Amino acid sequence: MGKIIGIDLGTTNSCVAIMDGMQARVLENAEGDRTTPSIIAYTQDGETLVGQPAKRQAVTNPQNTLFAIKRLIGRRFQDEEVQRDVSIMPYKIIEADNGDAWLDVKGQKMAPPQISAEVLKKMKKTAEDYLGEPVTEAVITVPAYFNDAQRQATKDAGRIAGLEVKRIINEPTAAALAYGLDKEVGNRTIAVYDLGGGTFDISIIEIDEVDGEKTFEVLATNGDTHLGGEDFDTRLINYLVDEFKKDQGIDLRNDPLAMQRLKEAAEKAKIELSSAQQTDVNLPYITADATGPKHMNIKVTRAKLESLVEDLVNRSIEPLKVALQDAGLSVSDINDVILVGGQTRMPMVQKKVAEFFGKEPRKDVNPDEAVAIGAAVQGGVLTGDVKDVLLLDVTPLSLGIETMGGVMTPLISKNTTIPTKHSQVFSTAEDNQSAVTIHVLQGERKRASDNKSLGQFNLDGINPAPRGMPQIEVTFDIDADGILHVSAKDKNSGKEQKITIKASSGLNEEEIQKMVRDAEANAESDRKFEELVQTRNQGDHLLHSTRKQVEEAGDKLPADDKTAIESALSALETALKGEDKAAIEAKMQELAQVSQKLMEIAQQQHAQQQAGSADASANNAKDDDVVDAEFEEVKDKK
C-alpha cells in the first residue's frame, strides 16, 4: 500500500506532509519552501502557474491571478459573504447555471474545486518528487465549521487533482493530533484556536490515554468560515487607499494593477508589524495623472493596525464562549491553548486569546505546519503505520429536514460524534398524500428557510391513507468525512429512496469526470511542453556548436558544404521559433547530414591538437625524467 499524504489546503498557503517512520515530515516544494501560496495564475500564453511563480507575476496579471479561492468553495453566488468578495477581488466572480459562485478566467467559466485542484496537484507532485513513486491517496483538511457542501466540494477538488481522498478531517483536530501525539502521558483538555487566511475555528478537544492508546475526542466546535487574515489585509488596504485619496485626490480602487501592488505591500506591512512597532508602506510610481507620476509613502504603526482590526479579533471571541458552553466546560477546565494559522502571529490576537483563557498559549506548535502534520498522522492511522490513536470528530452544525409550517426539525444535533446514524418517523400532512418531499437542511435556526439547504428528493408511491397514518422513516447517516447520506422509507409499502447529499448545487458526476479528464489532458500537454523545451535546448546547442565549427574550419570547408550547412542552420533556426517538436528534430537531422564534411575536418583538427599536445608532453616528460633520475640517485645514496 502506498503512502497516504496529508494536505492542508489553506486559503492563503498550503502544506503537504508524510509519515516518515513514526515521525511526520513536512515536505519542501520545488522552490525549496515548506508552504506553498494557494495562488493560481493563468498566463496569456496558456500556461498555468501555481504557488510562488503565480504570486510573483500577480502585479502584471491581476485579473487572471486567483487567490483565496477556498472562501468560494461550495458556496452560492448570492451568499452574503460571496457578495462581499465580488466587490473587492481583482478577479471576476460569476454565478454558475446551478447558482454556485464560479470564476470567469479569460472568458472561461471555472468552478472553485477545479482551481483548488491545481494547488492539490502541486502538493501531490511535491510528495511524488520526494518519495520517488506515484501518490494516489490523501487526507485533506477543512475548517471545522465547513458545511456539507464545502466538504463535498473539497473532496471533488481532490478527485480532479487525481487523488482519492481517504478522509476529510477538521483543521483544529489535525492540529491537536500534531500536538498530542508526542506529548506526556495523561489526560488533557485543549482548546485549538485556528485563525487562518480565510477561516476561523475553535475546537475543544479532550486527549485521553488508556493503556497506551490515545483518544482524541472533539467535545465541541464553532467558528466563522469567512473570517481570516485576508479580512485583516482588506482593512489595511482600505485605510491606505483612503489615506492616498485624501493626500492625492486619486481613488486607487479603479486601478487593478495598483491594488495588486497594494495588496502585497499591505500583507508585508501586517507581517512586519507583528515584530515591529511601525513600518513604512513605500510604493513609488503607484499611479499617475496629468501632473505626472504619484508615489505612496505612508507610515503605519502597530497601534493603527490594531485599531483597524480590533472588531475582527473580537468577532473570534464569541465562538469561544459558545464552544465552551456546548462542551459543558469553563475556562479553568482547559489545560492548554494552541494557536494555529498564520494570523495568530499577531500580538493582539495572542493577547486577546490569553486574556480569554487566563493562560498563555503554547508556543511549541508551528502554526503553519501543524495542520498538515496532523493530516499525515491521520493518513498513517488509516494505513496502519500509526497505531494506538483514535480520532473522534464531530459534526459542526445540526442536520434535519423541513417539516409542516416551514420548521427545521433536527435529526442530528451539532457537536455529535461522527460517524453517526439517526432515524426518526414522520407522516403525511394531507389525506391520501401519495408522495412526500424530503428537504434536507443544515444549521441552527428554527425557520427552515434561514438554514443552509443541502438538497431535496421525493419519496413516491405512498399508499392512500388519512393524514398522519403513513409511517415514513427518515434516516440520516454521516460518514467519517462528515458527509451526509439520507434515506426515506415508507414502512407500509417498503418503498425506499436514498440520496448522498451533493449540496443543493455543487458539481455533478459528469462535471467532475470532465474536469478530471481536463486535468489529465493538461498533465499530458505539460509533459509535451517539457519535451519541446528539451528538444529546443538540444537544437540551440547544435546551432551554436555547428556555427563555431564552421568558423574554426575556415577555408578547409568546401564552399558547397558551407552553403548547404548555412541553409540547414537557417532552417533549424526557423523551426526553433515554432512549437513543433517533430519539425525541430527533422531540421536537426538534416543539419547533421549536411555537416558530415565539417565533422571530418573538426575530428582532424582535434586529432592534430591532441598529437601536438602529446609531443609537448613527451618533451616535458624527457626533462622531468632527468630531474627524477637525479632525485632518485640522491635517494639511493642515502
Curated annotation (Swiss-Prot):
The keyword Nucleotide-binding applies. Keywords: ATP-binding, Chaperone, Nucleotide-binding, Phosphoprotein, Stress response. Gene3D superfamilies: 1.20.1270.10, 3.30.420.40, Actin, Chain A, domain 4 (3.90.640.10), Substrate Binding Domain Of DNAk, Chain A, domain 1 (2.60.34.10). It comes from the Bacteria. The keyword Cell wall biogenesis/degradation does not apply. Residues 603-638 are annotated as: Disordered. Induction: By stress conditions e.g. heat shock. One of its GO terms (molecular function) is ATP binding. The modification Phosphothreonine is found at T199. Residues 603-620 have a biased composition (Low complexity). Acts as a chaperone. Belongs to the heat shock protein 70 family. This is Chaperone protein DnaK. It comes from Salmonella arizonae (strain ATCC BAA-731 / CDC346-86 / RSK2980).
